[in-house]
A protein has these predicted regions:
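Intrinsically disordered, low-complexity segments enriched in serine/proline and basic residues
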Residues: 4-6, 11-12, 19-20
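Extended alpha-helical targeting/anchoring segments
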Residues: 20, 25-518
Length: 518
């Protein structure tokens, strides 16, 4: 290593079957080395990731996101909380995407180009097929891909019978950003993993360029930047689109459809809204700590800002394994552990709630079955209890093996929207939702997360979130309506589910210096 700290190639370890090469510059490690990549068969891939690791003990994800928002309007942050006292291993952050892909009523917009499509998945699949990446050991679960959302109304592309009777609020059916660079906090190792994807067509040239891009990311992270995120200011209190009376009337109509035999269950939602200025980022900062959840997300693009903490996986694809996590059955949290247990016992004995849960587990099995190998669909866990800051839920896990002819986008078609956000039978329930609800749902009840360059996918259901468009914040929530539902109780359930998000926004609006150690 020379005194200037320029790159040397060093063999660190000789193994029985292979030699592992690293590039070391100064105190930092780049992996894999160019020599290692040249020994691989990359003929099936367009991209390969390379990484640089630095210590992360001097910066937090929140601080870094504040900094990156000064560089780009297009950002995302994905995190998880695995149980009561344990954060997920990784936080993924991105900014300044390579491309932005949206679709609205069959009109696809890719950066500055606009064209018509029959189904947006065909173009999205083309993009992913042009960015096929090798999955390497020693890298985190996400190394680059598409990040964003599929709306609830995306369902219309795979089910033409879904006719829109609601007001069109201009929500994109798809809003995805293409990131070939990823910043990953590894909370276990207390390191930042900087990742760029380089082309496999000219390895020497692209590797040199990739090292430069990693160093540029490192510089941005270390550079002192005055972080000015405009604080959130509510201009009015939240009010519902549907009053209690109007929502209860809608529930009664839903019950009529059930009594007539059209459906067994339908999920009917309401939306709270308020005028506001500033950013939702501080609301996310509060929400991630007051309501930690398996899926926590913040992202912003040209026309929307979203902050949420969802408890529920829509669909996860890891190599060939598909998993979905139906959640149905709800109680408000108690004042203490004893009251919590009483509420849990009551929930598990409630025939209405258990019947609703069983119905939606069956629907999840059926949805997976459409794209899965014969006899591979299994209920992995059944009727577990999940506790969150404001509510208690019943949850199950269903998994299967995807058929060889299908991919992640076919899985989105099969699973979206989730039965827990629509009802059963799904198609008829969605038709009834479109008749009874006043507005398109947009991101609420849709799918949020990533589709990566290796073919994997992790999407949660768009619930327990707030979004901001045109200086208006919206929070949507719904309740599952069955034969013996009590309309007033379902209205209250919607308020309970929205409670954690409303509270986080009001805390951020109050200017509370809510300290976060992560």
């Amino acid at each position: 290593m020379n005194q200037g700290g320029t790159a040397d190639i060093t063999v660190l370890e000789s193994l029985t079957f292979k030699t592992v090469f690293f590039i070391i510059r100064g105190n930092y490690m780049y992996y894999p080395s160019l020599e290692m990549l040249e020994e691989m068969d990359l003929s099936q891939y367009d991209l390969v990731p390379i990484k640089k690791e630095i210590y992360s003990d001097m910066i937090t994800p929140i601080e870094l996101m504040r900094k990156l928002k000064q560089y780009s309007k297009h950002v995302y942050m994905l995190e998880s909380h695995e149980d009561k006292n344990k954060w997920g291993r990784y936080t993924f952050i991105g900014f300044d995407p390579k491309s932005e892909i949206t679709c609205y009523n069959k009109m696809m917009k890719v950066d500055d180009k606009i064209f018509k499509v029959t189904h947006p998945k065909e173009y999205i699949r083309k993009v992913l097929n042009e960015h096929r990446s090798l999955k390497l050991e020693g890298f985190p679960t996400f190394t680059g891909g598409l990040v964003g959302y599929f709306s609830f109304d995306y369902f219309k592309y795979s089910e033409p019978s879904i006719i829109k009777n609601q007001k069109d609020n201009g929500f994109n059916d798809v809003d995805l950003m293409l990131f070939d660079k990823v910043i990953c906090f590894d909370h276990f190792k207390q390191k930042l993993i900087l990742i760029v994807n380089i082309g496999t067509n000219d390895l020497q040239k692209n590797y040199k360029k990739g090292i430069k891009e990693l160093d540029e990311l490192d510089y941005i992270i270390r550079k002192h930047v005055k972080t000015l995120v405009q604080p959130l200011k509510l201009l009015e209190d939240f009010k519902p689109v549907l009053s209690k009376e109007e929502y209860c009337q809608m529930v009664e109509k839903g019950i009529d459809y059930i009594k007539e035999g059209d459906i067994f269950q339908v999920v009917l939602s309401n939306r709270l809204y308020a005028k506001a200025t500033g950013s939702l980022f501080d609301s996310y900062r509060v929400l991630r700590t007051t309501n930690p959840s398996p899926y926590m997300f913040y992202f912003a693009s040209d026309n929307i800002e979203v902050a949420g903490a969802s408890p529920e996986t829509l669909i996860k694809l890891e190599e060939t394994k598909l998993t979905t996590f139906p959640i149905a059955g709800t109680r408000k949290r108690g004042k203490d552990d004893q009251e919590d247990q009483q509420l849990i016992d009551d929930l598990l004995k409630d025939e209405k709630e258990v019947a609703e849960h069983n119905m939606l587990v069956d629907l999840g099995r059926n949805d997976l079955g459409r794209i899965s190998k014969f006899n591979s669909v299994h209920v992995v866990s059944y009727m577990d209890i999940l506790k969150f800051s404001k509510v208690i839920h019943i949850a199950s896990v269903v998994s299967s093996e995807i058929k060889e002819e299908y991919d992640a986008l076919d899985a989105v078609d099969a699973l979206l929207p989730a039965g827990t956000l629509s009802g059963a039978p799904k198609i008829r329930a969605c038709q009834i939702i479109n008749q009874l609800e006043q507005n398109k749902r947009g991101i609420y009840g849709g799918a949020i997360g990533y589709l990566d360059f290796t073919g994997n996918m992790d999407l949660c259901i768009g619930i327990r979130l707030a979004y901001k468009r045109n200086n208006e914040i919206s929070i949507c929530s719904g309740a599952g309506i069955v034969y013996d539902s009590v309309p007033e109780n379902e209205y209250q359930e919607c308020l309970n589910k929205a409670g954690a998000v409303v509270e986080a926004i009001k805390m951020a609006d109050g200017g509370i210096d809510y300290d976060s150690t992560h």
